[in-house]
Amino acid sequence: MAIKVHGSPMSTATMRVAACLIEKELDFEFVPVDMASGEHKKHPYLSLNPFGQVPAFEDGDLKLFESRAITQYIAHVYADNGYQLILQDPKKMPSMSVWMEVEGQKFEPPATKLTWELGIKPIIGMTTDDAAVKESEAQLSKVLDIYETQLAESKYLGGDSFTLVDLHHIPNIYYLMSSKVKEVFDSRPRVSAWCADILARPAWVKGLEKLQK
């Protein structure tokens, strides 16, 4: 049975899963979820994701939700496909695990808030909360200071090869690099170079194209 991704083309979490699948050279069916009409909050969608969020993922009889859990499943189960997104060396895996936690716990909260305020709200006709932007930008700046130091030690955040750590960052960075917060990234040379590198990955570009068809 085909892999299916239920989600929204605008959703950073949906983008994350699509990019992972394409990095692994896996075919999948994208099933758009009409969030404007509240489809994600109703049955039958709630049978796929009981929290009423996107994406939801199906691989045969297996059903998953939460984008980072989905990408880890893909990277491990399909380890021999496409690009290797996990570090198999037990001595290197801990570093990757640490920075995956950093992305989810430190980077994601301010980055997601900024993506919502500066990337999504203008598209759907809502007013940006300038105070929220200022607060989140200050939080993000502190995180990126640490990233700048880490990227002096390795080419990517989890080590010297591109992994899920970096992939998980891409969707929010994609939105923010088209906003005034771009300067927060550009003012840190190593962070800026890292962003340019990961945003240029063919799998990311192909993933966007697939979701926006």
Curated annotation (Swiss-Prot):
**Domain of life of the source:** Eukaryota
Keywords, ordered alphabetically: Transferase
Presence of the UniProt keyword Transferase in the record: yes
Q: Which InterPro entries match?
A: Glutathione-S-Trfase_C-like (IPR010987), Glutathione-S-Trfase_C_sf (IPR036282), Glutathione_S-Trfase (IPR040079), Glutathione_S-Trfase_N (IPR004045), GST_C (IPR004046), GST_Phi_C (IPR034347), Thioredoxin-like_sf (IPR036249)
Query: Which residues does the annotation say bind glutathione?
Result: 11-13, 40-41, 53-54, 66-67
Q: Which GO terms describe its cellular component?
A: cytoplasm
Transferase recorded as keyword: yes
Q: Which GO terms describe its molecular function?
A: glutathione binding; glutathione transferase activity
Cross-referenced SUPFAM superfamilies, in alphabetical order? GST C-terminal domain-like, Thioredoxin-like
Query: What turns on expression?
Result: By auxin.
Function description: Conjugation of reduced glutathione to a wide number of exogenous and endogenous hydrophobic electrophiles.
Q: Which PANTHER family did the record assign?
A: GLUTATHIONE S-TRANSFERASE F6-RELATED, GLUTATHIONE S-TRANSFERASE RHO
Q: What is this protein called?
A: Glutathione S-transferase PARB
